């Protein structure tokens, strides 16, 4: 499991990149995210979660029910037909998400663009 957290001073958004290996302990990931995620800021949590986006677990419960984020990816992102690359954003975030399929990967790439910059 890996997490990269990026916040830029004086800009009200936080980008968190996640790689969750297969079978990772979601409770540990939730504990790490609880420490990282800020309040009163636009949040984007995205990455390779290695479970189908429709699966319910401690991580999806925390991001959707507790942090009130919405999952934007609703198409298969892996060659096996599952949606394992997710993008959770704050409800107030006005973003556009598109996919692209690099030839060198078994995952689709996600391109996240702000429709309206929050600063």
List where the protein language model places each region.
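A shared catalytic/ligand-binding motif for oxyanion handling
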Residues: 1-119
């Amino acid at each position: 499991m890996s997490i990269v957290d990026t916040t830029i001073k004086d800009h009200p958004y936080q980008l968190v990149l996640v790689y969750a290996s297969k079978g990772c302990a979601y409770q540990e990931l939730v504990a790490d995210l609880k420490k990282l995620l800020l309040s009163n800021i636009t949040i984007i949590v995205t990455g390779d979660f290695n479970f189908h986006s429709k699966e319910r677990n401690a991580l999806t419960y925390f991001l959707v029910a507790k942090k009130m984020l919405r999952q934007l990816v609703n198409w298969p992102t892996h060659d096996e037909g599952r949606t394992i690359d997710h993008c959770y954003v704050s409800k107030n975030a006005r973003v556009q998400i598109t996919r692209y399929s690099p030839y060198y990967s078994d995952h689709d790439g996600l391109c996240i663009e702000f429709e309206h910059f929050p600063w």
